[in-house]
Amino acid sequence: MPFVFPDTTVSKDYFTDNNASGGEGGSPFDFVKLDKGAVLKKIKAWKDNWLISGVEVWMSDGSNKLVGKRGGPSGEFTFRDGELIKKLNVQASAPYSSVLKRRRLGAIWLETDKERSWGIYAHSLTEDGSYWPDVGSGICCGIFGSAGDAVDRLGFAMLQPISRAVLTDVKYPNLDMEIVASTPTTVAHQVFSNGTDLDQTFELSGSRSVTITREWSLTTSLSMTISVEVTAGIPEVVSAKTGFSWTVSSLATHSVSTSNTETKTWRWPLVCPPHSRILGEATMYADDIDTEYEADMELQLKNGKTYRYHVNGVYNGLNARSGNVKLDNLGPYTGN
């Protein structure tokens, strides 16, 4: 049977397992970064004869943690972006420590969904020390256990399977400071003639191919590892008494990143006086914006639990809107 010790600071509401494998000595530690949306990026371990003397981990938010001590033969593994743990063995050592016969951490082995594997093994391991925790979603949010001059026991905080991830409560704190596009693009230029005794109404129309983009940047690797929906309003330009300004549209569900090229068509009615020629010109604006956003990332887990953590990033978007219509009277229409 495995030699494991539960850690009550690691909630099984959010993680598949709170057991640390090894022995009962050392001082407890807890280095779990779910509240930052951070995931394990690199692990390095050192061994000394029959035990693992040190383990150091680096997280995607830039933080790191060393337990035990560096020294002796070592091995390390760096995760690629989006790479998940598929199998994990955290193995206790054989009971070789002093009179108390205490065990410590003896080996770590993992395999990923990219068919890569890594491990480090102390001497004289026994099969009864193997412990294969449920890896859940495959996302590791940190480590926990106990250590002193070596690593007594170790556990990996493996996130429960995720059913849905939603970026919600999105706010754009600097939106009122963003500049509205001021350079128009001409999309229609046409002359109309009226040789009758009555006003005539014509339609000025114009089209332009525009690439509409929306993207909420995600700065934590957890967010980049899973598929994320966004429930938010979109920054857009509206007419106000003093001109044009940015506002936020009504809530809708979006992909975290979209880019669609579409043909925008605008039509404007123009009235031409009797026996006159007029020139109609119309413009459009492409409103490009890069602005900071703040939001909550909501993880809806398959066990029915929900976890939220705060995120921030940059929203990048481009919208197209109708501009101005200019009407010039070209003088009398002579019929030529």
Give a label for each model feature:
Residues 211-262:
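Membrane-inserting effector segments that mediate pore formation, membrane fusion
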